[in-house]
């Protein structure tokens, strides 16, 4: 957000930062209706560094951390939803070109990270009928430095004309939000 516009679609008029914030605010409202306490890393169009996000996570000690994004690719036909969890201890990241170079420390939430990502991805596919790009592992800064189970959701490709049009629609954003809520509830139920 703020000065970091993220990816752009629709000839540069549609900005990832705006779509992400719109979905995040809707997600906050939906989770609060269910009694969840929700802390946002940004509630307006403001800039917050990755380090700042990690520090907020450490300060508030949430039960989970969800990062919402829109994907982009040079090839405009690529589409679909993917959800990332922290790479487990000793494993390579899904997005590494040289897997042997990236094995390293996971975190104490390995099992929880993947379970939450799986539940959210499953619900997203059911609600949106989007292409399944899978649950993947990565050592993204926000996942690596979260002090709780964490996922990063790529809600679709802003670079794909059809998907960017969907992502810009309130009804499609509601499908995404409802799916994330369902995934969180299913994740929580699996640990009770």
Located regions from the model:
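Active-site histidine-acidic residue metal-binding/catalytic motifs
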Residues: 1-62, 87, 92-95
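Short, well-ordered secondary-structure micro-motifs
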Residues: 7-8, 51, 76-79, 94-96, ...
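Second-shell loop/turn segments in exported
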Residues: 8-17, 39-47, 102-111, 121, ...
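Active-site-adjacent mobile loop/cap segments within catalytic or ligand-binding domains
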Residues: 14, 64-75, 127-192
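Extracytoplasmic/secreted envelope proteins and their assembly/folding machinery
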Residues: 21-24, 28, 51-54, 81, ...
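Soluble periplasmic/extracytoplasmic beta-strand elements of cell-envelope proteins
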Residues: 22, 37-41, 64-69, 82-85, ...
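A structural motif
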Residues: 76-101, 114
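Active-site-adjacent substrate-binding region
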Residues: 109-136
């Amino acid at each position: 957000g703020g000065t970091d516009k993220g990816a752009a679609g629709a000839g540069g008029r549609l900005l990832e930062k705006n779509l992400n914030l719109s979905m995040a605010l809707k997600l906050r409202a939906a989770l609060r209706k269910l009694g969840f306490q929700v802390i946002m890393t940004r509630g307006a169009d403001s800039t917050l560094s990755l380090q700042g996000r990690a520090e907020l996570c450490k300060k508030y000690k949430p039960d989970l951390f969800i990062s919402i994004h829109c994907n982009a690719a040079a090839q405009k036909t690529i589409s679909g939803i993917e959800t990332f969890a922290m790479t487990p201890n000793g494993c390579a990241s899904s997005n590494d070109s040289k897997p042997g170079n990236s094995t390293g420390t996971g975190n104490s939430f390995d099992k929880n990270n993947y379970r939450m990502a799986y539940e959210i991805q499953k619900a997203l596919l059911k609600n949106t009928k989007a292409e399944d790009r899978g649950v993947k592992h990565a050592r993204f800064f926000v996942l690596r430095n979260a002090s709780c189970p964490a996922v990063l959701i790529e809600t679709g490709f802003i670079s794909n004309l059809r998907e960017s049009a969907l992502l810009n629609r309130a009804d499609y954003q509601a499908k995404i939000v409802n799916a994330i809520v369902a995934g969180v509830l299913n994740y929580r139920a699996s640990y009770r």
